[in-house]
């Protein structure tokens, strides 16, 4: 029997519903249950693919090519289970599907309404394909009271009535703010949030209370009384040093035990959390530290690089070091000398991005790393700019540039118009739509057996996730390789470059894919593990 747990949020946004959902899933997994995580997003975009990273944060790409919410990254990292396009849906996607059906005549002239058509579509999404799971955890984006979230709250309310008794539960994540002048945590915002939730027909079974200090017994009793939950169901979600402490914290508070009790399951054994304790210990007690520069264009919102940050942390865990991140806006290097910003750092990473802004700054960062023998990791756009830099500085192609920025006589990077997905040829046009038209999802790459990157992977055939519209031009391969920039990995047909590396450099690698999307705390991605290892070596030379 599949059981459903719906996770909602109240009082303020950005409380960490995604992390809470992922942590609960990890706890249930450690008890031996099969868990699925899903996300309902109330915004009207069909997917986050065309949304600004500075507004929405990272776009997390799945193996099957879906552009999804960054919370799916938390789901994968905490559970180790790859997400799919079937694990995330938006209001925009639902409306698009419904309107397409209406235009086709599928509704036979019926009046299309939010209830029942939109709510039914939400319910169908939630209920579909769960036969293999013991628990399905469904996170509802946004905050209770948001207008755009009402159809989702109504849908999960209806599911509470339609599912068999004992098959559905609700967790409400809320905030207990501390007021210094009063010297106490305040429960009133949570009471009002729960009242709002109850007004639309949902009674939470568990309160997950974010706070920065212990909840006094009297405040727990007050919350239980006025929010109509058991006192044992008032769970303290206190701030922790690392997100990898969250499962440990929730486990100590008994969140998983309380969830099992809701479904009448006797929790015979405690979850096996030894590996989480190991991760926590390594994060808290590193044996050294390194400093990495991230030269990007969305540095104002760190969530734009969420998976990247975590992958670097995983590399640090693997090498038992703390990874300090120095965030540098790429445009600065277009006006100033990079040296004062990059001197003394142990590695330089240029992540993915779109557009011309900051591109020349990234090129200058790549040149500095190459000339100063500092470990360099270029991801997607970061690889492309490293190749442009090598074309200009090493191969003497002064006009080398990307057609993404406009016409150029030397298109070292150009628009990717066709490629193979398995045995099928996919095509795109320059004038086509932006949404969902990139090279998206997992693709296979073939690595040169004697290359550094093949040694790092321990294999010559790999599969990584992509999200890009432009690609390095293979017509320049011979001239670049003659100057020491090796095309060490390509698509299986040899037509598309996937990785480059600079020969004679301690560690200079560019990849067209996004390896950060597949890194896990218990399985650090080999490239990030190796990059941080190279940074550790560099730190001993400074």
From Swiss-Prot:
GO cellular-component term (any): cytosol
Regulation acting on activity, per entry: Allosterically activated by GTP, when glutamine is the substrate; GTP has no effect on the reaction when ammonia is the substrate. The allosteric effector GTP functions by stabilizing the protein conformation that binds the tetrahedral intermediate(s) formed during glutamine hydrolysis. Inhibited by the product CTP, via allosteric rather than competitive inhibition.
GO biological process annotation, one example: pyrimidine nucleobase biosynthetic process
UniProt-annotated binding residues for Mg(2+): 71, 139
InterPro entries the record matches: Class_I_gatase-like (IPR029062), CTP_synthase (IPR004468), CTP_synthase_N (IPR017456), GATASE (IPR017926), GATase1_CTP_Synthase (IPR033828), P-loop_NTPase (IPR027417)
Reaction equation(s) it catalyzes: UTP + L-glutamine + ATP + H2O = CTP + L-glutamate + ADP + phosphate + 2 H(+); L-glutamine + H2O = L-glutamate + NH4(+); UTP + NH4(+) + ATP = CTP + ADP + phosphate + 2 H(+)
A Gene Ontology molecular function term of the record: glutaminase activity
Amino acids binding UTP: 13, 186-191, 222
Active-site residues from the entry: 380 (nucleophile), 514, 516
Location of the region described as Amidoligase domain in the Swiss-Prot/TrEMBL record: 1-265
Family from the record: Belongs to the CTP synthase family.
PANTHER family in UniProt: CTP SYNTHASE, CTP SYNTHASE-RELATED
Described purpose of this protein according to its UniProt entry: Catalyzes the ATP-dependent amination of UTP to CTP with either L-glutamine or ammonia as the source of nitrogen. Regulates intracellular CTP levels through interactions with the four ribonucleotide triphosphates.
Record's subunit section: Homotetramer.
Protein's recorded name: CTP synthase
